[in-house]
């Protein structure tokens, strides 16, 4: 008996069988055969078993010549198509992958341990990639088409997704997925990874306990959110915390936490709730501290106002490459809020709101380090005075191209040490000795 698959393969030449058309056909048949009212009641394991049974029956009815390994791979691929993100699902499940970057249907990169790698995973074609994109965005009530060719979304596990399609994406649709880590890292993890020293780790704990306002600066993928999560864990459990994010990533351990997230506009362009609105509402919620995932626009002004009006110990992050650039960036974002202040007055406002700037950097070996800890100590003329307390200096690379370097104290004794003393927070004065060098 001849089947529709005899044209693409045979028992004698199973290795030449093109499984692409077979997967597509089976996928359509599986969707047509599934009773949606029943599968809605099944958990993941039950649904996987039902899909396996259904695909096996369809394969037998088509008399498709497949080896056991090919059959298992095909069943797994169909399960990924129905239950997950198709070819991307194994990458989503891979705990070593931090970012998934689809440049086009046949070019997919991942980031592992700070390094980019080209994978051999591909979509069948542009249409296949678009189906997965539409599956992602429809799950969060969004749409993507020529009239709305860019979308930010979130997977069920919290991973952030950005998708962009033609005509804006010239080489075909593109997806960027920043995976959501389920591991709640602690400060000891950063010490073990040589991102900072035990002495600096204890100093950071004291900075949070002393209710200093902290701005974490860094480029994309430098570990800003990771350090924000860790520093937030030092907030005492008897304080009320309100978090504000564009896309929920923070994983605070405390019980008394209210989590707020922005809302994009709906398909009609209505219903948007911005970070600015959430900050303003947050101030009516009696927070002891505000933790904002990142300041990107005019909400920077509202965050500074909160820091200046009794919400000491608040924390946020910002995109900038150096501590000084970070302050310039803050000025730019405040201007986006429409505040018309003289330069000196604006800088005085910034200097009175922010106490400490942490600079995060991703180095050439992919490692992420805190490369500077600085204190804002006021104004000198029209310039914000920024004193560097610690800095990381790269000294070289080993045979594996791993970065080696030292953390060094500048010799400046920070003003916040007096606050530590008043609050009974212990600090070893020797750590500010410029003669002491901490190798990592």
Where are these regions (language model features)?
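Switch/coupling sub-region of P-loop NTPases
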Residues: 201, 205-217, 226, 230-353, ...
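P-loop NTP-binding catalytic core
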Residues: 94, 102, 107-210
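Conserved glycine(s) of the Walker
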Residues: 223
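NTP-binding/hydrolysis catalytic cores, primarily Walker-type P-loop NTPases
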Residues: 366-440
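Solvent-exposed alpha-helical segments within well-ordered globular domains of core cellular machineries
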Residues: 20, 24, 28, 32, ...
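Active-site phosphate-binding and catalytic loops of NTP-dependent enzymes
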Residues: 38-41, 61-68, 83-94, 136-153, ...
């Amino acid at each position: 008996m001849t089947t529709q698959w005899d044209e693409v393969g045979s028992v004698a030449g199973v290795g030449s069988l093109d499984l692409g058309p077979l997967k597509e056909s089976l996928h359509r048949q599986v969707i047509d055969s599934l009773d949606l009212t029943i599968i809605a009641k099944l958990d993941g394991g039950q649904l996987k078993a039902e899909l396996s049974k259904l695909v096996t029956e369809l394969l037998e009815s088509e008399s498709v010549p497949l080896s056991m390994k090919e059959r298992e791979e095909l069943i797994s691929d169909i399960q990924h198509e129905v239950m997950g993100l198709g070819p991307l699902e194994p990458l989503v499940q891979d705990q070593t992958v931090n970012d998934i970057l689809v440049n086009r249907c046949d070019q997919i990169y991942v980031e592992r341990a700070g390094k980019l790698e080209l994978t051999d995973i591909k979509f069948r074609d542009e249409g296949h990639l678009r189906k997965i994109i539409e599956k992602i965005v429809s799950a969060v009530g969004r749409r993507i088409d020529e009239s709305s060719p860019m979308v930010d979304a979130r997977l069920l596990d919290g991973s952030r997704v950005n998708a962009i399609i033609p005509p804006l994406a010239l080489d075909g649709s593109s997806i960027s997925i920043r995976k959501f880590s389920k591991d709640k890292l602690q400060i000891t993890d950063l010490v073990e990874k040589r991102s900072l020293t035990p002495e600096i780790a204890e100093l950071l704990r004291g900075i949070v306990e002393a209710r200093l306002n902290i701005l974490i600066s860094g480029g994309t993928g430098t570990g800003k959110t990771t350090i924000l999560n860790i520093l937030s864990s030092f907030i005492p459990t008897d304080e009320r915390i309100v978090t504000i994010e564009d896309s929920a990533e923070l994983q605070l351990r405390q019980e008394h936490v209210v989590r707020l997230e922005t809302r994009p506009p709906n398909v009609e362009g209505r219903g948007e709730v911005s970070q600015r609105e959430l900050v303003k509402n947050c101030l009516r919620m009696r927070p002891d501290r505000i933790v904002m995932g990142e300041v990107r626009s005019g909400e920077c002004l509202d965050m500074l106002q909160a820091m200046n009006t009794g919400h000491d110990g608040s924390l946020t992050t910002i995109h900038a490459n150096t501590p000084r650039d970070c302050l310039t960036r803050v000025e730019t974002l405040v201007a986006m809020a429409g505040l018309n202040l003289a330069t000196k007055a604006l800088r005085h406002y910034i200097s009175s709101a922010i106490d400490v700037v942490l600079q995060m950097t991703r180095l050439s070996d992919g490692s992420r380090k805190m490369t500077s800890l600085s204190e804002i100590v006021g104004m000198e003329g029209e310039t914000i005075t920024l004193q560097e307390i610690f800095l990381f200096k790269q000294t070289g690379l080993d045979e594996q191209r791993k970065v080696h370097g030292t953390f060094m104290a500048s010799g400046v004794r920070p003003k916040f040490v007096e606050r530590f003393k008043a609050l009974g927070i212990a600090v070893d004065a020797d750590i500010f000795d410029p003669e002491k060098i901490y190798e990592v």
